[in-house]
Regions:
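Glycine-rich anion/phosphate-binding loops
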Residues: 46-53, 96-114, 145-153, 196-201
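Second-shell residues forming the walls of enzyme active-site clefts
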Residues: 4, 17, 25, 43-61, ...
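Catalytic domains of carbohydrate-active enzymes, especially glycoside hydrolases
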Residues: 29-41, 110, 117-122
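Short glycine/serine-rich loop/turn segments
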Residues: 87, 122-146, 165-169, 173-192
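Structural recognition of alpha->loop->beta junctions
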Residues: 16, 31-35, 88-105, 194-214, ...
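Short, flexible, mixed-charge acidic loops at enzyme active sites
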Residues: 78-89, 176
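Preference for extracellular/luminal or secreted protein segments
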Residues: 1-35, 246, 265-365
Length: 365
């Protein structure tokens, strides 16, 4: 594998963001280059029909299984809102207070049906960080609660519900972002927990999600000093091997956005890209800048050509992303979107979930 074939294989490990509510020339160029999917933000959303049209246009442009992905957690972090025609799901803390796996599964089913109606294939949910630090500025009510067993049980139920509707779930943020006092969108958090504590608290929900068959896991840009004082989890083999060895998860691991300040302001992209794949991460999220997206692909190709990343590792990562792409659906029927969304409405479920003001979205940076 070399030349154009190698370039396309490297691009095939990237999921990228873009600006606008229709396919831009920049995103179409990346689709042609071979990226496996896109991530949608609020900047890409005007209405349900428009999202369906956008999803379909990108899938048709790709002419291959192509992933449309989104953060649709509920509460503060949801790109698709009631004003667009979607159900306003409360924060997962509200679901956690009910303590009912059946309810969590119903929430997952509802999310999955609405996302599938507009052509979205993967939801970066559930958050299975344990809410163990009241001063945490970024997790808080995005978590199901303070009890690791509860977080794992409800997170697994929600993931099963999502995936029953053909939408890939993603457990995040491995190995745990719940006890930090800094936001990795803006800073590089550090935790000094011993392995015993990590195993009992932070890792427990990820084991539960792995056993439940979650389709993917997202990494945390957090330094775990007892394991690797130099690198955040995303770039650390010492941390990421816990996902395979302690949690038993052998599917695709996806990085959090490599443009977040926890990574971009502390590590050059020339280090970040090879370190991330060598750590055992299979897919790269690069969410904002076309120039940086192309450069990251170039840097991965260069690292493989120079032998700094074994070709076997590229093959392994490609195989795991292929598992994720099994969730890639056909372009949605735009004319049926409103009817499908109306059919998903669950007033009795809404009655069991107290509404709450979403609050500030910590991921909107």
């Amino acid at each position: 594998m070399r030349g154009a074939e190698l370039d396309r294989a490297c691009a095939g490990l990237f999921c990228v963001g873009f600006h606008g509510t229709a396919p831009s020339p920049e995103i179409l160029e990346l689709v042609r280059r071979g990226v496996y999917g896109v991530i949608l933000f609020g900047r890409n959303v005007e209405s349900a029909e428009q999202v369906a049209e956008l999803s379909g246009a990108l899938k048709r442009a790709a002419q291959r299984p192509f992933m449309i992905t989104v953060d649709q957690e509920g509460g503060r972090v949801a790109r698709l809102r009631a004003l667009h025609g979607f159900t306003e799901i409360p924060a997962m803390r509200v679901v956690g207070r009910e303590g009912n796996p059946g309810l969590a599964r119903e929430v997952g089913v509802l999310l999955g049906r609405e996302l599938r109606a507009v052509g979205i294939d993967q939801d970066y949910a559930p958050v299975v960080d344990v809410d163990s630090n009241p001063a945490n500025p970024v997790i808080g009510d995005r978590s199901f609660g303070r009890d690791p067993e509860l977080v794992g049980r409800l997170g697994a139920a929600l993931a099963v519900g999502l995936q029953s509707e053909g939408v890939a779930a993603c457990a995040k943020h491995f190995p745990g972002h719940g006890d930090t006092s800094q936001d990795s969108h803006r800073h590089l958090p550090r935790l000094s927990h011993a392995m015993e504590r990590l195993d009992a608290v932070e890792l427990a929900p990820f084991r539960a999600l792995s056993m439940a068959g979650v389709a993917s896991v997202m990494t945390a840009h957090v330094v775990f000093e007892a394991l690797d004082p130099q690198r955040p989890a995303t770039l650390s083999l010492a941390v990421m091997r816990l996902l395979r060895e302690r949690c038993g998860f052998h599917g695709p691991a996806i990085s959090d956005d490599l443009e977040m300040k926890a990574v971009s302001e502390h590590f050059p992209l020339e280090q970040t890209v090879p370190d991330t794949i060598l750590a055992g991460v299979d897919g790269f999220l690069v969410c904002h800048t076309a120039e940086r997206q192309h450069r990251a692909i170039d840097l991965l190709r260069k690292a493989i050509e120079e032998g700094r990343v074994p070709r076997e590792r590229l093959v392994e990562a490609t195989g795991r992303i292929a598992l994720l792409k099994k969730f890639a659906g056909d372009p949605p029927d735009v004319l049926q979107v409103r009817e499908r969304l109306r059919a998903t409405k669950r007033p009795e479920l809404a009655g069991r979930l107290p509404s709450a003001l979403p609050g500030r979205d910590p991921t909107a940076v």
